Amino acid sequence: MEVKVLSSIKEYQPGPQIPQRIWMPLGLPSRGTRLHDLICEGLPFEFFDRIASHLHVQREVVSKAICVSPTMLSRRAKAGRFNTVESDRLVALVAVFENALYLFENDVAAAARWMNSSNRGLGWNRPLDMMRTRVETKAVFDLIGRLERGVLV
């Protein structure tokens, strides 16, 4: 008797990883349990300045993007750590910037300009202003994907 393997069963192939070029200089893992643990514990405050510097934006811009008031930012600096929600928003901001870098072929200045510019595909909002919620962040990821594929927005 012959055993047939179903042709509809496919071998698992892991999805594309987020490139390391932005994560490594920041000292953050791009995925996996280390990243999950860091977010749950709260990112150390030192990552805030690294992220702002790497994204070529001022601290106030990053603070506003992740919905942290100046008063709360000073509290986080004293505590030395962000909470889970703020950490998640910071990591989402890095991931969006990574995709913008890919869109602009690693031109950091162009990606930073795009992140700071009003965009028709986002209802004339800036991508940096769309980091408050997962839905808004997903809209930015979706827009980058459409632009990469040449879909008019």
Roles of regions detected by a PLM:
Residues 1-153:
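Non-transmembrane "mature" sequence context
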